[in-house]
Curated annotation (Swiss-Prot):
Residues 1-76 are annotated as: Disordered. GO terms for biological process: response to antibiotic. GO terms for cellular component: extracellular region; plasma membrane. InterPro entries: MFS, MFS_trans_sf. The keyword Hydrolase does not apply. The lineage of its organism: Bacteria, Bacillati, Actinomycetota, Actinomycetes, Mycobacteriales. GO terms for molecular function: efflux transmembrane transporter activity. This is Uncharacterized protein Rv0876c. It is a multi-pass membrane protein. Gene3D superfamilies: MFS general substrate transporter like domains. Residues 1-10 have a biased composition (Basic and acidic residues).
Amino acid sequence: MSGRRGDHPGRMAPTPGRRTRNGSVNGHPGMANYPPDDANYRRSRRPPPMPSANRYLPPLGEQPEPERSRVPPRTTRAGERITVTRAAAMRSREMGSRMYLLVHRAATADGADKSGLTALTWPVMANFAVDSAMAVALANTLFFAAASGESKSRVALYLLITIAPFAVIAPLIGPALDRLQHGRRVALALSFGLRTALAVVLIMNYDGATGSFPSWVLYPCALAMMVFSKSFSVLRSAVTPRVMPPTIDLVRVNSRLTVFGLLGGTIAGGAIAAGVEFVCTHLFQLPGALFVVVAITIAGASLSMRIPRWVEVTSGEVPATLSYHRDRGRLRRRWPEEVKNLGGTLRQPLGRNIITSLWGNCTIKVMVGFLFLYPAFVAKAHEANGWVQLGMLGLIGAAAAVGNFAGNFTSARLQLGRPAVLVVRCTVLVTVLAIAAAVAGSLAATAIATLITAGSSAIAKASLDASLQHDLPEESRASGFGRSESTLQLAWVLGGAVGVLVYTELWVGFTAVSALLILGLAQTIVSFRGDSLIPGLGGNRPVMAEQETTRRGAAVAPQ
């Protein structure tokens, strides 16, 4: 048994009887992609690779070609005159090549190209870029065309139509992927392909004279694209642990993916979409940003299929489960064959630290989803022209982007020794900010709340990832990560629904969401203290939960 010190809530306790990272059991076959640890290698300057906790990586069979460290200068023929235009073109080509090499070097750092993380980075960037381009495409219609009352009523109706199926399907995505041997890459590509079809439908129904879309087409397509974006996040979470390089942990992997998505997807993709939208709208009366969406989604579907095949391997995995029942016939991991012989199925309950971090992150996600939709309706209800409304929303969006980037930058450098404690503190901070914004009822208070909420959400998510990596055995880590992401997206949907349904007065909206945050904070604190307000879904479980069998009394420990 663990000592009392190890069972303290929020502390990462050592795992009794768990396979070590240095053991041969956990050594993944992908280590064949890294340099051999022989005598000549030890004498070299490069240190030997760290042992890996990722068992999904198979050998590629060949070493990648060494990348070019510099771009060779472009030479000119003798007697050729270099004009100002030609010099500018050469300089632009050289700068572009250097920028490409810089991005490629960052994307392949720490062995990411061998583990498959680089292949996953590009679809993640494409997903961020699609969201940013869609925001540009819909900005003109939402802020310069539709009436506020019409927007509010129709969005509430279509939100119910599109979000309700997602709320039912999202909890089933994780278990379905656990049972499928082949389907993760296809599911990722399908999330892009369906968005391509929706963008084409919007383009076909675009009215160039008014610069708008029919309401019955606009809102279902826009909300459905949001649902597919969230579905991509859930699907990606089940793939990420399988492409984790051996030299970095899950926290750094997710922070890297988010930073790449923000810089290469949200900022670069949004800027390109804005430029194309401006040119196409003024010259051709066409929705240029939607053409960018079509191009990015097609590229994203293709890039998703280039993710390594070993992400499909699920043999030997034990699915994770949110619930915990003490009276079930539990079975330690050294007796899996007895369970299979008797027809039972092993399940890995989440430990106390994980469930506490999950409740805290869900509470924060409610606030994030609320801030995603509610400020748009508040700005639309404001008695001002479209540019002022767009400026109000731009302030909130900038605060969210800065907070998200700062949170991911900070979380990658934090020592997450007690992640559950950090999650509780972030949840308290976000709840206090929501109450303060309800009292102030001003745009400045909303921007400050958005800034700190975005940063707190990134730090709390990194803490949840740290708990998942430490407190779950390797064979349940990918499943646990997918289950947690599904739950977080449902919490986001709940917050977005509150933002659509409540009245467009700042103090009213923040009062409504504060009531939900207080309930979530109470469950988080109670779970942290080892109890629960909801039976079976709280912290009344050990820090390191043993595996259970779904068949009550199906297996008995051998004598």
